[in-house]
A protein has these predicted regions:
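Non-catalytic accessory regions of SAM-dependent methyltransferases
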Residues: 1-38, 43-46, 50
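Conserved hydrophobic residues forming the short capping helix/wall of the S-adenosyl-L-methionine
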Residues: 18, 112, 163, 238, ...
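Residue-level signal for inorganic ion chemistry
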Residues: 33, 71, 101, 133, ...
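Conserved AdoMet
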Residues: 34-111
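Conserved SAM/SAH cofactor-binding pocket of Class I
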Residues: 103-207
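Helix-to-beta-strand junctions that scaffold the AdoMet/dcAdoMet cofactor pocket
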Residues: 168, 216, 242-244
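Mobile active-site "lid"/loop adjacent to the S-adenosyl-L-methionine
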Residues: 199-230
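Conserved Class I SAM-dependent methyltransferase catalytic core
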Residues: 225-288
Length: 291
């Protein structure tokens, strides 16, 4: 007779199994996947720790374990990722939102009035992916006008769904567009433009963790030979879409500050070049003000 698997015994076994296979945060990963399987919360796993799993639940959980052993990111397995204390649906069509990217949200919110204004600001998010940045901004300052673009139609559709999930469908305008292509500068000028563009050098991508180089969309990672191709494009084009005195905020690689400073410094359109550090102390966000 096979032993009965309870929640707590399964958590202990899975933690050990993940640990032996070099999976990061083995206990937390086991909790997240088991809670997802049972459609409950991680806290409830411990409240119901002696509850046995059914055969179908065990089969489903074992499938999720194997996916994680194959180094598929937890966010893709569960289809969900928290960002800015909001829950986002994620698929392999979009980059998984990272905590470091919350720095660009913080820096942008500092530029936006907290109270309702008779003259709402216009904000544009380039390469929106799951919509994490623009939705986080709109959730905090819903009285402004928001636009977001992505070259991937699948990403744009997913971002719209995430906006609807958070009641922001009427607040954010999503466009399928390669950077600025679908935006007419004669009709739209923005107070703030934000972006988390691809900035990883092409030859570095194969050296990244399997969770990244096997599963996340290459189009959202690959910044060409030096990682700066899309950053250059945005820096070059943004002045045509920014109001005078408007701001451009870009996420950059942790080691790209000097290179990005040279590119930005060669433009006559910007002043007040500033770099903002992430939670690990790396210069993560470039902040520019248009003359």
């Amino acid at each position: 007779m096979e032993p009965e698997w309870t929640i707590i015994s399964l958590l202990k076994w899975t933690e050990s199994y993940f640990n032996s296979h070099g999976i990061d945060s083995p206990r937390m990963t086991a909790e997240i996947l088991l809670a997802h399987t049972l459609k409950t919360t991680r806290i409830n796993l411990y409240i119901q720790h002696d509850k046995p799993l059914s055969c179908s639940e065990l089969i489903q959980f074992k499938t999720l374990i194997q996916r994680r052993i194959n180094r598929e990111p937890v966010a893709y397995i569960t289809g969900s990722k928290e960002f800015w204390s909001l829950d986002f649906t994620v698929t392999r069509d979009v980059l998984i939102p990272r905590p470091d990217t919350e720095c660009i949200v913080e820096a942008t919110l500092a530029l936006l009035p907290n109270q309702h204004s008779d003259q709402p600001k216009k904000i544009l998010d380039l390469g929106t992916g799951s919509g994490a940045i623009i939705i986080a901004l709109a959730s905090e300052r819903p009285h402004n006008v928001y636009f977001a673009t992505d070259r991937s139609s699948a990403a744009a559709i997913l971002a719209r769904k995430n906006a609807a999930k958070h009641g922001l469908s009427d607040t954010i305008h999503f466009l399928c567009s390669n950077w600025f292509d679908a935006i007419n500068p004669n009709k739209h000028s923005f107070d703030i433009i934000v972006s988390n563009p691809p900035y990883i050098p092409t030859d570095i991508i194969p050296t990244l963790a399997p969770e990244i180089n096997r599963y996340e969309p290459r189009i959202a990672l690959d910044g060409d030979h030096d990682g700066l191709s899309d950053i250059r494009k945005i820096l070059h084009s943004a002045p045509d879409y920014l109001l005078n005195g408007g701001y451009l905020l870009l996420e950059i690689g942790f080691d790209q500050m000097n290179s990005v400073f040279k590119i930005a410094g060669n433009s006559s359109f910007y002043n007040c070049i500033e770099f903002i550090k992430d939670y690990a102390g790396h210069h993560r966000v470039l902040k520019l003000k248009k003359n």
